[in-house]
Amino acid sequence: MKIQVENVSPVERKVSIEVDPDRVAQELERAYAGLGRRVKLRGFRPGKAPRKVLERQFRAEVESEVLEKIVQQTFAEAVKVESLPLVAPPHVSVSEGVADGKPIRYTARVEVKPAIAPKDYRGLEVTRKAPEVTDQMVSDELSRLQDSLAQLVPVEGRFEAQEDDWAVIDHEGTIDGKPFEGGKAEGVTVKVAPGAISDGNLEALKGKKLGETVELDEPFPEDHRVEQLRGKTAHMKVTLKALKTRQLPALDDALAKEAGVEGIETLDALRARIRADLEKREKRRAESEVKDALVKAALAKNEFEVPPALVERAIDSMLEGAAERFARSGIDIRRLELDFAKMRADMREQALLQVRGALLLEAIADAEKIEVTDEDLQAEAARIAEELGAPLAKVQQQMRGKDAREALKNKVREDKALALLSSAANIQPA
């Protein structure tokens, strides 16, 4: 096999590969032998059909499979021989395919990690903001807790729905005059607010009195979870049965107990726990801001190109994170009218910074010969378990897989590189 590597750019290589005719012939022979054992042809016992007969019927299929197999195998071999630090799958172009007595020739364009010789990363000058927790921050957290423990109670002395009420309804729907599954229900609670009834909102009830019925058309989106309803419009009859409102619990010891925080029985104890948690959070935030500042300062002294594939992957990860946050709030991001192209464009700068920072920290770790020990991994697992409030054994179990362990190892190595930058930096109070 002949391999030629051309540097297209600091982050791209063009790999030209020529595969010997003998290897091609051997793979063809193996492919036809395997095919002969599998297929049944009239007039031949299993495994006895001559290759020429097989070629007449299956040549294109066999040659396609052999070409794919040889390209996969030889490209992997070339990557190993040339020590190419790939960051994405190759773009392959075959110039000469499978032919009797001839070599296979193809090229693969690949993105690779840039070669970085880090410099001037010691003595960086950054500022550190002192973490601060105010009484207002504690009160805000208590208010959020209070809101999360609110309950729906009947509205007293009023019989007309207002915005932000919670309405108990019976509804009956039809599509093209026919009932549909899920169209009829009783005792359903919806919010009197803008939005779709399928999302738990019904603004049309505003101003309606108990016992009144409203009629409306409800369009279902093209990506509705029920396939039969996608793109259809339902005619709904909705009857208002009861009105409820959210009632906040009092800020007292009973709320502190209801919060379910271990060891907390009084409001004063809850305030103290919230303050302690906020102090930890603000300390972590201050440390994170210093780390971000150190990375930005180091990047300012080290210019290098970044593989586009890594940036796109970082954007994908950011979008997945956004989708997960929406999902935790009960919102399907696919049903929102979002401009994903604009979102990707808006995320690009942050994604580029993330990728550049990770590549530089990896290069610094290489330059400083930073190693990660089993003790380091155990300590990180213990830290994660404490932060999540999860059993250490459970965290360790999740990290036993090869990919999870490698990801953890990379994070610990990156953290060690950051610690080195911090210890060698000139950090002044903000």
Swiss-Prot record:
Transmembrane segments: none
Segments forming domain PPIase FKBP-type: 164-249
GO MF, one example: protein folding chaperone
Keyword Cell cycle tagged: yes
GO cellular component assignments: cytoplasm
Catalysed reaction equations from the record: [protein]-peptidylproline (omega=180) = [protein]-peptidylproline (omega=0)
Keyword Disulfide bond attached: no
Compartments where found: Cytoplasm
InterPro entries: PPIase_dom_sf, PPIase_FKBP_dom, Trig_fac, Trigger_fac_C, Trigger_fac_C_sf, Trigger_fac_ribosome-bd_bac, Trigger_fac_ribosome-bd_sf, Trigger_fact/SurA_dom_sf
Enzyme Commission code(s) on record: 5.2.1.8
GO biological-process terms attached to the record: 'de novo' cotranslational protein folding; cell division; chaperone-mediated protein folding; protein transport; protein unfolding
Alphabetized UniProt keyword annotations: Cell cycle, Cell division, Chaperone, Cytoplasm, Isomerase, Rotamase
SUPFAM superfamilies: FKBP-like, Triger factor/SurA peptide-binding domain-like, Trigger factor ribosome-binding domain
Family (UniProt): Belongs to the FKBP-type PPIase family. Tig subfamily.
Free-text domain note: Consists of 3 domains; the N-terminus binds the ribosome, the middle domain has PPIase activity, while the C-terminus has intrinsic chaperone activity on its own.
Job of this protein: Involved in protein export. Acts as a chaperone by maintaining the newly synthesized protein in an open conformation. Functions as a peptidyl-prolyl cis-trans isomerase.
Listed name of the protein: Trigger factor
Chain's gene name: tig
